[in-house]
Amino acid sequence: METRGTTGEETISYWFDLPIDVAEFEEKLGIGAESGDYRIIEKVLPYADEVHEHTSVYQLNELDFMYRQLSSDMQEEYVSLLTVFENLEALYICRNVIIVYPDCKIMIDVARQKLMNDPTFKHLSDDCQEYYFDFEAYASHLQEHGKFLVTEHGIFELPE
């Protein structure tokens, strides 16, 4: 961040880690956090596209809070998830209804995991499930009737 000095004033720059402590910000730059007399000149953030030169300290802290509330799987696949969600806030709002299948690479893996976690099928033996359950058909059904995002590190089941 740097101050926006008027003619003849010295420009002060300082690097802050998030979340930004407002008191430290005001002390280091010598201006109020609400003044708007500063601008962001550099940033290294996963959600950098949502931060602009005039983003306020409070907005930065809010974005940082939302990002930190995402699961580690969602943080790891943040860029992929943004192909489905409009922005960080939209992802943050839906974070608790997104189901992550971190060990799944294909939809058949998801079908198997769903079956293993479904109490309806708990009483069936593994042999019975393996021989009589059509995982390919169930995977196709899931894909046709659900919304999934397949990533390098797992599969995300998204809200409709």
Residue ranges and their predicted role:
Residues Y78-V79, T83-T120, A137, P159:
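Extracytoplasmic/secretory-pathway segments with low complexity and glycosylation-like composition
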Residues E2-G8, L45, E152-G154, L158-E160:
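Short, flexible beta-strand-to-coil junctions
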Residues V22-E89:
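Structured domain cores in non-transmembrane regions
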